[in-house]
Structures are given as structure tokens and as C-alpha cells.
Design a protein with these regions (language model features):
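Conserved sequence/active-site signature of Rossmann-fold short-chain dehydrogenase/reductase
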Residues: 67, 134, 186-188
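Substrate-positioning beta->alpha
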Residues: 110, 188-190
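Conserved Rossmann-fold NAD(P)-dependent oxidoreductase catalytic core, especially the SDR/UDP-sugar
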Residues: 86, 90-150, 154-168, 178
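Short acidic, glycine/serine/threonine-rich loops at helix termini
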Residues: 17, 42-44, 72-75, 95-98, ...
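Conserved beta-strand scaffold in the Rossmann-like NAD(H)/NADP(H)-binding core
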Residues: 61-63, 128, 180
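N-terminal Rossmann/SDR dinucleotide-binding element
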Residues: 1-82
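Gly-rich Lys/Arg/Thr-decorated short loops/hinges at beta-loop-alpha junctions or inter-strand turns
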Residues: 22-24, 54-57, 94-98, 174-180
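Feature representing long, continuous alpha-helical segments
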Residues: 11, 37, 70, 112, ...
Length: 190
């Protein structure tokens, strides 16, 4: 029984991850999303399934963003998260082209915030949901996802990582395994 956190839990990829993870019966499934409506929708669906199938899983909806590192760390420590699936991202190519700064903040800085919180909380596994557009990127969205991947690769190679915002001598041992998956175009994703 693991404690699992899914960021972007209300999105098309995040919500499907939640459905699949539920079948594996984690002790706790934490759903984090910045959209109240999307979070409510996936929560309601999963609660119905838990009741119907008598699953021994605790669901926790967390309204929040990967741009809030303090909240991420608090959630991961409080619920002793074992695995993070980081699906929160802006993924619409034209939208990110027109909103470059927001794309960078969400896809790159949000990933950095989530990864650093995982390191600080001693999370065992961190899985980044990436995209095939990160391979030799030709657009801003693909570039932001590639930067997110490179960020995790850099953190994974550090035995004793120094995190952004660390003050003084902070001794930390990297206990987090970082992995990433690249999806192609996903049928039915918004």
C-alpha cells in the first residue's frame, strides 16, 4: 500500500493515470489540480468506483498548483508520499506559443518545484509525464518539456543535491529515483 500523488489529476492524462492507479489499490491516492471543476469531476468518478468495488483506498483532493513549492512539500511530507506522477503541464502547442512565459513557468518551474519537494520529502519514485515533442523540439511547448526532462536528469545525477532556495549548509542525500515517459498524441486527450 503506497501513498501516490498525481499532479494535474483533473487533466486528460492525469485523470486516466488516477483510474489506472486506483486499480492497483494504493493506501492513499492524492489528486492535485488547480482546476476546481476538473478536480471535482475526477474525485466524484473515483469515489463512485471505490464505493461500487469496495476498494480500500483513501482519496484526497488537493486544490493547488505546482507553482507553490511550500504546499507541494507539505503535502508530500504530511501524507508520506512514495510515488509522484507529475502530469501537470500546459500541452496545447498553439496556446503555449502565444503564452511563452506561462508555459515556462508551468512546465519547467512547476516541474522543478515538484521535483525539489520530492527530494526534500524523501519520495522514492518520481515519474514525469513528457511528450514526443520534447525530441528535437520545434515549438515552445516541446522545448519546455525538454527542459523539464533535463532538469530531472540533472537532479538524478546529484548524490547530495543543493536545491534552489537552500540557505547555508544543508546536507541532503538523494533518495528519489527520477524517470520519465514520453507519450505521443493521445487519443481523446483535450
Amino acid at each position: 500500500g503506497q501513498s501516490v500523488l498525481v499532479t494535474g489529476a483533473g487533466g486528460s492524462i492525469g485523470s486516466e493515470l488516477c483510474r489506472q492507479i486506483l486499480a492497483l489499490r494504493p493506501t492513499t491516492l492524492l489528486l492535485l489540480d488547480h482546476s476546481e471543476f476538473n478536480l471535482y469531476s475526477i474525485l466524484s468518478e473515483l469515489e463512485q468506483r471505490i464505493a461500487r468495488e469496495s476498494l480500500p483506498v483513501r482519496l484526497l483532493p488537493i486544490l493547488g498548483s505546482d507553482r507553490n513549492p511550500e504546499k507541494l512539500l507539505d503535502v508530500m511530507k504530511t501524507w508520506r508520499v512514495d510515488t509522484v506522477y507529475h502530469a501537470a503541464a500546459y500541452k496545447h502547442v498553439p496556446m503555449v506559443e502565444h503564452n511563452i512565459a506561462e508555459g515556462v513557468l508551468n512546465n519547467v518551474i512547476g516541474t522543478l518545484n515538484t521535483a525539489q519537494a520530492a527530494l526534500q520529502a524523501g519520495v522514492a519514485n518520481f515519474v514525469l509525464i513528457s511528450t514526443d515533442k520534447a525530441v528535437r523540439p520545434t515549438n515552445v511547448m516541446g522545448s519546455t518539456k525538454r527542459l523539464a526532462e533535463l532538469t530531472l536528469q540533472a537532479l538524478s545525477h546529484e548524490v547530495a543535491p543543493v536545491l534552489f532556495g537552500d540557505m547555508g549548509n544543508v546536507s541532503r542525500v538523494n533518495k528519489t529515483r527520477f524517470t520519465m515517459v514520453r507519450f505521443g498524441n493521445v487519443l481523446g486527450s483535450s
